[in-house]
Amino acid sequence: MAAEQGLANAGRGAQSPAAAAPVPGRFVVFAIVSLALLMASVDQTIVATALPALQHDLHAQVNWSSWTITIYALGQILVMPLAGKIGDQYGRKRIFLGAAVLFTTASLCCGFANDIYLLIVLRACQAIGGGAFMPSATGIVAQIFGPNRDRAVGLFASIFPIGGIIGPVLGGVFVTYWSWRGIFLVNVPIGIALVTLGAVFIPASARNRGQRLDISGILLLGATLLSAMFGIAYLGSGASSPADPAFLVPECAAAVALILFVRHCARAPAPFVSVRFLAGHGFGVMNLLNFLFGSAALGFAALVPLYAQERYGLATLAAGTLLTARAAGMIATAGLAVFLLRRTGYRWPILVGFTLTAVGLLAIAASPPGVSAYGWMALAAGVCGVGMGVSTPAANNATLQLAPDQAAAVAGLRGMFRQSGSITAVSITAAIAARSADPGMAQAHVFLVFAAILLCALPLILLVPEHRGRW
């Protein structure tokens, strides 16, 4: 979902004179940047399957090992808007190649990390590279395809979900037949090829130095999420209680940073997020729903492989394929949901989708009724995927229609709230599991809470801006 921000920015570079006609060799360039996007998207999910092996080798608790997932998402939230604007100012090719070098170097170092804290820092570096790939690559595609940029960008956007299917399975293969270190080292030869081919084939782009970067806003948002994550992780270590200053100080710092972030957005001339997009007409309810959806649906995706291994003892490769069932459910229904949007409007698909996702979460948490654990969880994951496929297009359009002339900013806002929800859910769940004598059952109880949150949010859907037909 974080990728939406970069993908939505495609139209900005498309208006330059350089984009007036298709560029020779554009299909080679398309293949290069598509491979980069696929690599970055795979790294969003590949670590989830490898968490137990990673924890064992690095002697880490789940509350800290889960940071290898959440820090990657956090880094992308913060980097993508920066990378998009810097690419416009200094050239997308430079940003793309710099991102490829950073991502490849960080991947190599991740593969040889012998400490969980060092691995977390290196994953943050990976996130900077991966987050910069998306807006720069999308701008390159929009530039080189000229009048056909709409179809090219649409096809390019469809590549990102493929990583969600490949990642967990690929992670399971590496852990089963080699080592968790392989999930990072596999990026190195690919990254070297990207840098070499990109330097030769990607054309330079025009520069636009008229945009300002809201560094203060991005730092305040980063401080909010990072402080909250740190306090929750420390609580999960079992060395503190909710009354311990080691927990309270970071959480209070997060609250202060959040207040300052909102205040900054209200006063800055060119804020990272317009205050109108935070609480303006229709935005408040959509932001809340996107946050809750990210907590339940995206947090679920990050945690299911670990849950399957800890509660049922499933093999790593089998646990990874559970997310393939979720992705299959999404793919099977999302296209139909998009086709029917003009007839159904937005509220009904979101209502049905949230309900189905909640049912899937309830099933995941329940004990298998006389069937294999793998079969039951695959079915439940598929139901969650169907729910996500039904609701996501409607939620996307309902948010975009609030400000169709600022689609890039709105898509980025939507991705920010969903990823923030995911980060919050994974951090809290990991802390609870780390303090529990039975981590598998603890995660099952968290899935029940996720389901309850989605069901309690159903009345809010009545406040979603409704629309049928074209817009």
Predicted features, each with a name:
Residues 2-200, 336, 343-344, 352-355, ...:
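Transmembrane-helix bundle of Major Facilitator Superfamily
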Residues 25-42, 47-51, 62-71, 82, ...:
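12-transmembrane solute porter fold
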Residues 27, 149, 202-219, 239-243, ...:
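Short loop segments and helix-boundary regions at transmembrane helix junctions
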Residues 78, 132, 193, 223-226, ...:
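Residue-level signal for the membrane-embedded core of alpha-helical transmembrane segments
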Residues 87-94, 148-152, 207-213, 271-274, ...:
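Interfacial helix-loop-helix linkers and transmembrane-helix boundary segments
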Residues 139-140, 144, 173, 201, ...:
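A residue-level signal for alpha-helical anchor/packing sites in multi-pass solute transporters
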Residues 162-196, 213-251:
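Helix-loop-helix hairpin linking two adjacent transmembrane segments in secondary transporters
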Residues 188-207, 222-234, 253-268, 457-465:
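C-terminal membrane-cytosol helix-exit motif in multi-pass small-molecule transporters
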